[in-house]
Amino acid sequence: MWKLASIVLATAAVCAAADPDLTGIWSPSRATGPGAPAPPTPIVVKPAYKATFDGLTAKIREASARGEQYATKGLCSPYGMPTMLQVAVYPMEVLQSPQQVTLIGEAFSEVRRIYMGKKQLPLDDIAPGYYGHSVGLWDGDTLVVDTIGIKESVQGYSNLPHSDQMHITERIRRVSADRLDDQVTIEDPVTLEKPVVYTLVYRLLKDYQMVEFVCDNNREYIDENNIVRMKMGSQK
């Protein structure tokens, strides 16, 4: 009897100490009413970047009003961080182990790795890339992720300009069985007057299987005005 009780208590202790489980396939969603996250903070860029940012924002809005898509990246280029975190309706799969949390975006089959329990590398030791270098640790039920080393050509959140000094901090938490929140803070001492903070909300897709997404550049092209067009049957 006492032996059984000891086993039960030991098992309970292990379970209590286990890291929160973020695994699953998560679809971008919205939360309204009670429990909804705070709205995004305004984007305030430094004067040297304001004209470029405002001009690009205007072109995107004008194209959208015409029902068109203004190209902000190459057709087959990945979105990279932080845009890959929420691309239209495309879901994201989270795989988790004690050593690494892996995020797989269905759009462009993007893969991002978060190395757990590691110290962040010096920026000079990181080869700039689409996803940068991410390290994570647990703060209670929240995964705190630190990311640097994203190259300047990568599309930014809401197309904000960024330098190689951009620093992204995330606080990822499973709010309920079927909801995941990711609070994102973007800092850049070169391009931003103040940090940009926003929260992404995801819903669990219980019976979904990720679909292969390969960009072969056969259906679309970018015209001379930077608008994404569909190729006609006779075009190559």
Feature map (PLM): residue ranges:
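Bacterial N-terminal signal peptides that target proteins for export
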Residues: M1-I7
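PEST-like low-complexity, intrinsically disordered acidic/proline/serine-rich tracts
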Residues: A17-K236
